[in-house]
């Protein structure tokens, strides 16, 4: 017997898809399978749990049982999918199997942990489950090393500093947020972190970790070392593609899908952090919301392509928040930076003086929506 639409995953992407399907069809069979508890929480909250004094269980917004009852679902929590037989249209776990009409992969992404000696001592904060496993160590830690100065690393550095901890942030790049914007734009946040007491080790490399009687010894390049109580890897995410690969689907950085969120198999779709949409991996909330709306229509028989507008990315650093949009990482842009006491507006323009990207901060973030309208689609 078919289980109708089967979704592997229970995170933000899966839940958005369920809600959009149920707005249009209250009765089509929906089955969700995931390795976690399937309780709902807001993942961006993980960047602020330490300063807010929150435990992992405090993040739960809705239990799996409440979710199943509200949306008429068959849920299989704490269940590891081991294989997908795409030809037979069957999903398999160790003790069960599910026939599907359509299958959606919403398997997310896992935190990348640098392959250095002692890497098992590094913690990750990519899920409620991961935070639950290390919350006592993080709460008790006085000295924290954050590896990676990107979006998540910068958010965590500020949060741990606000909680009164001694924070060191290390990154290979010459500036923070290097994959998102040039140093002349990120320098305002970088300066604020330094003012708060974050010790920035830029153009630096972690070479290994070793447990000691009094903490963890981190060995760095140039014959340097520091001792800390906890080390957090914030070095990016890697789309979870193992199941898709075993099913014979086309994989690049993520699970390759077209504008209809369809994989190389006509009955299998991918959504969220695991998906690579026409060559782009977009692990942000707004593209996932828009993708879920389109995919719900397509699963119910419509033929709707995904069209993504210019979208804001929010960096949640409360002492100096930032919004950005457009091709901020383009190397050929000229940046026009206007800095005032109440904030910054940085405009990235091309050779024809066309706005291609912008970054705004603090009280000037209200200018973002006007700038967004002038970006090319």
Curated annotation (Swiss-Prot):
Which InterPro entries has this protein been placed in? FAD-bd_OxRdtase, FAD/NAD-bd_sf, FAD/NAD-binding_dom, NO_rdtase_NorW, Rbx-bd
Q: Tell me where on the tree of life, at the top rank, the source sits.
A: Bacteria
Q: What is its EC number?
A: 1.18.1.-
Report whether Flavoprotein shows up as a keyword of the record. Answer: yes
Keyword Cytoplasm among record annotations? yes
Q: What is this enzyme's class at the first EC digit? A: oxidoreductase
Question: Which cofactors must be present for this protein to function?
Answer: FAD
**Which molecular function GO terms apply here?**
oxidoreductase activity, acting on iron-sulfur proteins as donors, NAD or NADP as acceptor
- GO cellular component terms? cytoplasm
Pathway(s) served: Nitrogen metabolism; nitric oxide reduction
The record's catalysed reaction(s) read: 2 reduced [nitric oxide reductase rubredoxin domain] + NAD(+) + H(+) = 2 oxidized [nitric oxide reductase rubredoxin domain] + NADH
The function of this protein is: One of at least two accessory proteins for anaerobic nitric oxide (NO) reductase. Reduces the rubredoxin moiety of NO reductase.
Q: Which HAMAP family match?
A: NorW
The family database entries (NCBIfam families) matched by this protein are listed as:
PRK04965.1 (NF003437)
Family of this protein: Belongs to the FAD-dependent oxidoreductase family.
Give the protein name, as stated in the record: Nitric oxide reductase FlRd-NAD(+) reductase
Organism, by scientific name, is Escherichia coli O9:H4 (strain HS)
Encoding gene per record:
norW
